[in-house]
C-alpha cells in the first residue's frame, strides 16, 4: 500500500507541474544507470546538468536521451541478449527487433556522449566501422557491447508536456566500463559533474520524481541478488488522467493516452 501511495503522490506532482501543451507523441529514449556494487552499499553514477539547459537544468540525472535513426545499424560485438530483446518487445505499441536494438544501443551511445564512459569490447575492425557519435569507440578500437544491459523500467512522460519521452531505463554493472574519454565533463558541457552516489543517500532525493520511482525499482532488484532478465519490469504511464504502474507484458489497458 505504501508503494501505491507513493506512486499516486508522485503522479499528483507530475500533474501539478504539467504545462498542458497540446498533444505530442512521445519520442523513444533510453537511459543508462551504471551501478558499482564493489562496496557494502551499491552506488549509482549521476551527472549534474548544466543550469542553462532547457530540460531539468541543474538537476542530477542519469545519462540518457533520444534514440537516433542510425542506432540500429551500429555494429556491435554480439547481438543484444535474447532475454533483453524479449523484454523490450513487450508492451504497446508493438515494435520490431531492430527498434529493440536501437533502444539498447542508444543507452550505450548516450552514456558515452554525456559521461565519456564506454561499454564496449576490442575489435580489429572498429576503426573502419564507426564514426560520428561513435568516434570515441573507434579511436579506442572498441565496438559497443550490449551484453551487460538489463531493462529495469519503462516510463512515458504524461500528456500535456511539450517534451515527452517513452523511456526505457537500463542498468549495467560498472565493471562493463572498458574505456573513459577525457574532457567530456567540464563547466560548459551538458553534464558538469559526475558523482558515484550510494543508493538511498540524500543527493538522490532531488532526482526527478519518476526517476526516483525507477531507482526504487532498481534498489529492490539489487537487494535480491544478481540482476536477472526474468524479473518483472514495471511500466509507468498515464491512463484516464491517472498514473498507472503496470508490468510489461501484463498490462490490462492499452496506452491510448500515451
Sequence positions of predicted segments:
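N-terminal leader/linker segments that precede catalytic domains of diphosphate-processing enzymes
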Residues: 1-258
Amino acid at each position: 500500500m505504501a508503494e501505491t501511495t507513493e506512486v499516486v503522490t508522485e503522479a499528483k506532482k507530475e500533474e501539478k507541474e504539467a504545462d498542458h501543451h497540446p498533444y505530442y507523441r512521445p519520442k523513444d529514449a533510453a537511459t543508462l544507470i551504471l551501478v558499482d556494487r564493489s562496496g557494502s552499499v551499491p552506488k549509482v553514477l549521476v551527472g549534474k546538468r548544466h543550469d542553462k539547459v532547457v530540460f531539468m537544468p541543474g538537476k542530477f540525472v542519469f545519462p540518457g536521451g533520444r534514440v537516433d535513426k542510425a542506432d540500429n545499424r551500429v555494429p556491435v560485438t554480439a547481438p543484444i541478449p535474447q532475454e533483453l530483446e524479449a523484454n523490450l518487445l513487450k508492451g504497446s505499441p508493438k515494435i520490431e527487433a531492430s527498434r529493440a536494438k536501437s533502444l539498447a544501443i542508444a543507452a550505450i551511445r548516450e552514456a558515452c556522449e554525456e559521461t565519456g564512459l564506454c561499454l564496449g569490447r576490442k575489435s580489429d575492425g572498429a576503426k573502419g566501422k564507426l564514426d560520428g557519435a561513435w568516434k570515441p569507440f573507434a579511436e579506442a578500437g572498441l565496438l559497443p557491447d550490449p551484453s551487460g544491459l538489463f531493462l529495469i523500467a519503462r516510463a512515458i512522460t504524461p500528456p500535456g508536456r511539450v517534451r515527452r519521452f517513452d523511456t526505457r531505463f537500463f542498468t549495467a554493472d560498472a565493471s562493463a566500463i572498458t574505456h573513459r574519454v577525457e574532457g567530456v565533463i567540464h563547466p560548459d558541457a551538458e553534464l558538469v559533474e559526475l558523482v558515484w552516489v550510494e543508493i538511498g543517500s540524500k543527493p538522490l532525493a532531488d532526482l526527478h520524481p519518476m526517476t526516483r520511482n525507477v531507482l526504487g525499482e532498481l534498489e529492490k532488484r539489487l537487494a535480491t541478488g544478481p540482476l536477472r532478465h526474468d524479473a518483472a519490469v514495471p511500466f509507468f504511464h498515464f491512463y484516464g488522467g491517472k498514473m498507472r504502474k503496470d508490468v510489461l507484458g501484463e498490462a490490462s489497458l492499452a496506452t491510448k493516452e500515451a
